Regions:
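Feature primarily recognizes SF3-like P-loop helicase cores of small DNA viruses
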Residues: 2-56, 84-481
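TRNA-binding/sensing appendages of the translation machinery
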Residues: 54-91
Length: 481
């Protein structure tokens, strides 16, 4: 006899059926009847071939869209099971205790057992509502074996469409905004739209080949968040989209769900710590993240999530390994800041989602062939500025200082001259005092930082450096300030 039938707990309605003249007989009849009903219920659920279990988690199958979705645990699972399965079978009044017993039996039923590998498709396949696209070959088919744990909420356009950009996307991206001539697209606009389409395709695919994090950069009310939310809305179920910061993930907060999602998007890139910086590089590389388990060995989890950031400007990368981060960034600028937001734009994007996403994957497949994203002057200019700022301390030391055995310079004088140097060279974000002083000590082996030196200009005892001098030999500001 099934363990399920040995653990049946009577509903209160069963007790009402007892009579004074033959209570045990009535109880036995109720018990046998409930046994038969629960056996029939279990058989009905198994025969539906929609509920599966890997021994730990339950999954619900939607075969028409090849989606097998992981179900919640605990009381949420009981509630889902009751509302979405038992109600359709006429058992919505089954007690919670009996539902849990039924789930325990189903969890070990070999007929609904499923291995994770069965529904984890190759990264080169993309699941649309109307079929599956192979992004390596461009082949699209409505018939495919196996299942996915997500489906894009759109159809792939299998017929030839005119290669004119969707109006909703042009409205968002044209520079400057020119709604009366929305179809008049400059080469600059065309290049930007293609880059955005490539980025959308890359985000929605599972492939990590390009190893990039996407950055939408621009002022408030420029449309970057609208586009990010549109991309997120294409991914279903919604549990496949997360909004954790790198700091939250680095601290172990929901790390498992974050790395296994399809998309994680946040407002800013927070790489202020070495731990979050390492996590950023690891997640973009598409490797594996080792997560500690409370009562088991640590688990290596493949990283799947694409990272998308919506920023007003690039984060402060000073004092970090900026070069190691920059080559992992795909920057897209949003310059159209509007005074009044267009409340219809999000709906327009969603209405044109079939065309936008189809064009996005066509653009991304071209990117895979040429092994690079479309060049962006916006990104090139931004990286050039960052490179100059990142090396401003080195350039100042090389251009303005020299080794001098008897030389003495006050620390405050050095930093003032460095700031003047940055201002004269158009550097808006000078580095810190610590960065400057460390570069000086690294450059000049005979130089030393002293708590007290005699300032050659004022005669006062101040903190400063010995063994160096300004190249002008005068001790005055080299900019005449």
């Amino acid at each position: 006899m099934d363990a399920l039938l040995q653990t049946i707990i009577f509903d209160r309605s069963d007790m009402k059926n007892l009579t004074e003249d033959n209570p045990m007989s009535k109880t036995s009849l109720c018990f046998n009847k409930r046994q038969e009903e629960l056996l029939q219920l279990k058989t009905s659920i198994v025969n539906q071939k929609k509920l599966y279990c890997d021994g730990n988690d339950f999954y619900i199958l939607q075969p028409e869209i090849r989606l097998i979705e992981k179900l919640p645990k605990g009381n949420e699972l009981v509630r889902f099971f009751k509302d979405n399965m038992l109600k359709k079978l006429g058992y919505e009044n089954l007690s919670v205790a009996n539902i849990k017993s039924l789930l325990n039996e189903l969890a070990v039923d070999s007929e609904i057992h499923i291995e994770n590998a069965v529904f984890e498709k190759n990264m080169e396949y993309v699941n649309f509502r109307n079929g599956v696209l192979d992004i390596n070959t461009g082949n699209f088919t409505a018939e495919v074996d196996g299942y996915f744990d997500y489906v894009l909420d759109c159809n792939y356009c299998t017929v030839d469409y005119q290669h004119s950009f969707p109006n909703s996307l042009l409205k968002l991206l044209k520079e400057p905004m020119d709604l009366e001539n929305i179809n008049s697209v400059s080469e600059k606009d065309k290049s930007k739209v293609i880059l955005v389409l490539e980025a959308i395709g890359y985000i929605l695919a599972d492939s990590q080949q390009e190893r990039k994090a996407i950055f939408f950069i621009g002022p408030t009310a420029s449309g970057k968040s609208t586009l990010a939310k549109f991309i997120a809305s294409i991914i279903t179920p919604k549990s496949m989209v997360k909004k954790y910061t790198l700091t939250q993930m680095a601290e172990g907060f929901s790390s498992m769900s974050a790395v296994r999602a399809k998309l994680n998007y946040a407002d800013e890139l927070d790489v202020s710590s070495k731990k979050s910086l390492q996590l950023f590089k690891l997640m973009v590389s598409g490797g594996e993240l080792t997560l500690p388990q409370k009562y088991a060995e640590d688990r290596d989890v493949p990283i799947r999530a694409k990272l998308l950031f919506c920023c007003n400007e690039l984060p402060d990368l000073h004092n970090l390994q900026a070069e190691a981060i920059m080559d992992r960034m795909l920057l897209i600028g949003f310059k159209n800041s509007v005074k009044k937001r267009d409340s219809t734009l999000a709906a327009s994007l969603y209405e044109q989602r079939d065309l936008i996403v189809s064009m996005a994957f066509d653009a991304y497949m071209e990117t895979k062939k040429k092994r690079k994203f479309t060049d962006s002057k916006f990104a090139q200019d931004l990286f050039k500025i960052y490179s100059v700022e990142q090396n401003s301390n080195k350039n100042f030391v090389n251009d303005c200082l020299k080794l001098a055995t008897d030389g003495k310079i006050a620390s405050s004088k050095l930093f003032d001259e460095y700031n003047s140097y940055c201002q004269a060279n158009g550097i808006s974000k000078p580095l810190s005092r610590h960065s400057l002083y460390q570069e000086i000590l690294t450059k000049f082996a005979g130089c030393a930082e002293q708590k007290k030196i005699r300032d050659p200009n004022t005669g006062r005892s101040v903190q400063g450096f010995t063994g160096i001098a300004f190249k002008d030999d005068e001790g005055e500001s080299i900019y005449g300030q």
